[in-house]
Swiss-Prot record:
Gene Ontology terms, MF aspect: pyridoxal 5'-phosphate synthase (glutamine hydrolysing) activity
Assembly information from the UniProt record: In the presence of PdxT, forms a dodecamer of heterodimers.
Annotated pathway: Cofactor biosynthesis; pyridoxal 5'-phosphate biosynthesis
Name of the protein this chain belongs to: Pyridoxal 5'-phosphate synthase subunit PdxS
Gene3D superfamilies reported for this sequence: Aldolase class I
Organism: Caldanaerobacter subterraneus subsp. tengcongensis (strain DSM 15242 / JCM 11007 / NBRC 100824 / MB4)
Organism lineage string: Bacteria, Bacillati, Bacillota, Clostridia, Thermoanaerobacterales
Length: 292
């Protein structure tokens, strides 16, 4: 089991420094691959449309996932509802490369997340703080991403979550060994993982940024804040020029600390997605609060 998990962590590590894009058709997947995406997330609807449509959001139709898998040579991910291990079993049977247990879909279980040790396929999970990240890793997640607030085109929550996780990691590195057990209790996370973070100053898995990334500048901001890579959902195919936006975001992630290049790739992209002011959302419309 541990060998398998090490392999899964290494698979996630290979995506480091890259962009993972949400796609809803084989054509979009091809655009993403051409633009330099390291993986695609196969969906029926991007988060902005899920948000607009309302109702219950579930796993995508296997037909869509198969068509997208057939169209590209890069890894394909797909989302399942929090706690819905049968949706995960179906995705594993389809030969998906990564499963995202995602708060963007309507949670199926409000008490338990999926026990990811039951699966061979690697999982990615969202987190808004260190305790949440470590609980997901304890359940077998091979990759963490900020939750942000998907489908809003507003990066503020992703920034908040990344800063929060970084600050909590930094704090652990300053604690003496005798204080770590109390920290584990406070974080509601296993002691061995808390100890690992305290010793290494980082999570034991890669930590990507997600939720509200809409422009090359947003992507570079998350990288400068310490993200290992970025997920871009609605931001690409809800923009005026998806091909150009996709290529620009990939470049921005590669050259995140080179303002001259960022200025160049940000030019003439057309309108970014309209976006939503998060303060206008009601509590029930917030995705980041789903899961624990």
């Amino acid at each position: 089991m541990n060998e398998r998990y090490e392999l899964n962590k290494n698979l996630a590590q290979m995506l480091k420094g890259g962009v993972i894009m949400d796609v809803t058709t084989p054509e979009e997947a091809i655009i993403a691959e051409k633009a330099g995406a390291v993986a695609v997330m196969a969906l029926e609807r991007v988060p902005a449309d899920i948000r607009a449509r309302g109702g219950v959001a579930r796993m995508s139709d296997p037909k869509i996932i198969k068509e997208i898998k057939a169209a590209v040579s890069i890894p394909v991910m797909a989302k399942v509802r929090i706690g819905h291990f049968v949706e995960a079993q179906i995705l594993e049977a389809l030969g998906i490369d990564f499963i995202d247990e995602s708060e963007v879909l309507t949670p199926a279980d409000e008490m338990y997340h999926i026990n990811k040790w039951d699966f061979k396929v690697p999982f990615v999970c969202g987190a808004k703080n260190l305790g949440e990240a470590l609980r997901r890793i304890a359940e077998g997640a091979s990759m963490i991403r900020t939750k942000g607030e998907a489908g809003t085109g507003n990066v503020v929550e992703a920034v908040r979550h990344m800063r929060m996780i970084n600050a909590e990691i930094k704090r652990l590195t300053t604690l003496g060994e005798e204080e770590l057990m109390a920290a584990a209790k406070e974080l509601q996370a296993p002691y061995d993982l808390v100890k690992y973070v305290a010793q290494h100053g980082k999570l034991p898995v890669v930590n990507f940024a997600a939720g509200g990334i809409a422009t090359p500048a947003d992507a570079a901001l998350m990288m400068q804040l310490g993200a290992d890579g970025v997920f871009v959902g609605s931001g690409i195919f809800k923009s005026q020029n998806p091909e150009k936006m996709a290529a620009a975001i990939v470049k921005a992630v590669t050259y995140y600390d080179k303002p001259e290049i960022l200025a160049e790739v940000s030019e003439g992209l057309g309108e970014a997605m309209t976006g939503i002011d998060i303060r206008q959302l009601e509590e029930k419309d917030l995705y980041a609060t789903r899961g624990w």
